[in-house]
Each structure stands twice: as structure tokens, then as C-alpha cells.
Amino acid sequence: MYKDIATPGRTKEILERYGFSFKKSLGQNFLIDANILRKIVDVADISPDTGAIEIGPGIGALTEQLARRAKKVVAFEIDGRLLPILADTLSPYDNVRIFHQDVLKADLHAVIAEELADVSDRMVVANLPYYVTTPIIMKLLTERLPIRGMVVMLQKEVADRLAAKPGTKDYGSLTIAVQYYTEAEVIMTVPRTVFMPQPNVDSAVIRLVKRQHPPVVVDDEGVFFQVVRASFAQRRKTLFNNLTNNLPGGKENKEQIERVLVALGIDPRRRGETLDIAEFASLSNALAPLFGK
């Protein structure tokens, strides 16, 4: 059995050997506790039938744990300085393919079709860079990829937002999007002390299992997400003010918006953060004739 990468000593030795310096702009924080990585792989239920998709492999600490259990691992790394390190640390494994690419610009459907066509199970497993967590999550959710779901480590405050309940400070448009596409569960908190370099905040591992069907019936998804985003645009404002000020054409349709809210039994003075996903669905369906294409 090969020695784990995710120990303080081995990580330091690898970084010193290659003269690697962390780039703050890329949100590079490498995990140095292999037990946490094994737990992540367990939670993701990685098996010999799984094709794992990783984002930001760093020096390969999570990648090697995935490679030991999965049929194949496909990883996206934006920092070219890490490619020779990954070629070295992952040399014992012949089931890993590294793409030197920004995952936000990648055609994931094409990569999956080319690299993971022969696996029956696909899962995203990643320690996401803090600076692009939300765009990556939104891309993975909205592109309707042929995956079972994702297990990701991210900033604890973002994890709290993903799994928040209505009426709480963490509840927002990201929560609704996650709820619409997946079932979310925060698995564990990961202290900042198990990273190199140590970040200023704690992390959390969250599991998102893709839903076969959304939990609500939505007539026009474009309008649904438009209404959700508008409702949270200015958290201190009322739902009515947010909709009229932030929906395109909202001011011109002010009276109709108020009529719709009253007809649905939604007090126009409520704030967006108090509505649950079912209320947002009803509201967007009623507004779709006004704001749909």
C-alpha cells in the first residue's frame, strides 16, 4: 500500500521538492488528514463501478483515495504548475486522467461521454476552491449531467447556505437552486487546522443527491429562477418591492404583480427569505404569462 499524500510530512516534502508556492488567487488549501478524505470517499459511495469527477486535485491527495476505489477518475486542474506534481504522485495509478482546464469552461457532457461512457455510476467528488464554489455548484446543477450526485467539501458558510431552511439568514437563491435539483445533507464540519496553508474559516462536507424530478411543478424554469433571484436581490426589502424593482418589466407590471401575490394568499409585505420552494413555484407559475418568453 502506498503512503498517503494527505499527511503534514508528505505534503510538505512534495511541495518542497517541487518548490511549489501557494497561489492565494486560486484558493489553494491542501487537506493533510487522510482519514477525512477516506470518509469523503465513503460518503460518496465510490465503488469499482464508479467514474469519479474531481475538481481541483491539487497534489492528488483526494485523487489517490478515489483512484484506489473507483473504476476511473477524471480531474480538472487549472494550475499548470501542479501537472508535473500530479504526474509524479499519481504515477502508481493507471485509472486517472488529468485535464489542465478551468472546469467552468469545460464541456462536461463531452468529457463524460468520452472518458466515462463505460461506467454505470458517476459521481462528482471534490474539495472545491473557495473563490469559485458557487459558480461551480451552479454549473454542476444546471447542466443536468448524467451523474448520481456530488460530495463536495467547501466553506462551511456556503454549505450552510446550500442546506438552509426558509426564514434563516443563510436561506437564499442558491438554497432554492440546490433544493430544486438535489437533496442536500451536510455530512460533517472540517476544522481549518487540517489544511495547508490554514484558511481563515472552517469547511464542511455536503452530499447532494440528484433528484429524478424536481420537488415542485414549474411551468417555466427561466421565470422560476428569475423570480427567485429577484426576490432575494435586496434582503431587507419586501417581496413586492424586490419583484417590481428587479424583474425585467417589473415596474410596468406593478399592479399585476400585486394582484398575483394577493390571489395566491402571499402578503406582498413578506420578505423573499420567508417563502419556501412550493410558494416560489406557485408565484413563478402565476407570473409566467407576464414574464415568460
Swiss-Prot record:
Alphabetic keyword roster: Cytoplasm, Methyltransferase, RNA-binding, rRNA processing, S-adenosyl-L-methionine, Transferase
Enzyme Commission no: 2.1.1.182
Superkingdom per UniProt: Bacteria
Any one Gene Ontology cellular component term annotated for this protein: cytosol
Main enzyme class: transferase
GO molecular function, one term: 16S rRNA (adenine(1518)-N(6)/adenine(1519)-N(6))-dimethyltransferase activity
Pfam families reported in the protein's UniProt record: RrnaAD
Catalysed reaction, written as an equation: adenosine(1518)/adenosine(1519) in 16S rRNA + 4 S-adenosyl-L-methionine = N(6)-dimethyladenosine(1518)/N(6)-dimethyladenosine(1519) in 16S rRNA + 4 S-adenosyl-L-homocysteine + 4 H(+)
Residue sites binding S-adenosyl-L-methionine per the record: N29, L31, G56, E77, D102, N127
Cellular compartment(s): Cytoplasm
Record keyword Cytoplasm present: yes
Task performed by this protein: Specifically dimethylates two adjacent adenosines (A1518 and A1519) in the loop of a conserved hairpin near the 3'-end of 16S rRNA in the 30S particle. May play a critical role in biogenesis of 30S subunits.
Family (UniProt): Belongs to the class I-like SAM-binding methyltransferase superfamily. rRNA adenine N(6)-methyltransferase family. RsmA subfamily.
Alphabetized HAMAP family for the sequence: 16SrRNA_methyltr_A
Name this protein carries in UniProt: Ribosomal RNA small subunit methyltransferase A
Biological classification of the source: Bacteria, Bacillati, Bacillota, Bacilli, Bacillales
Encoding gene per record: rsmA
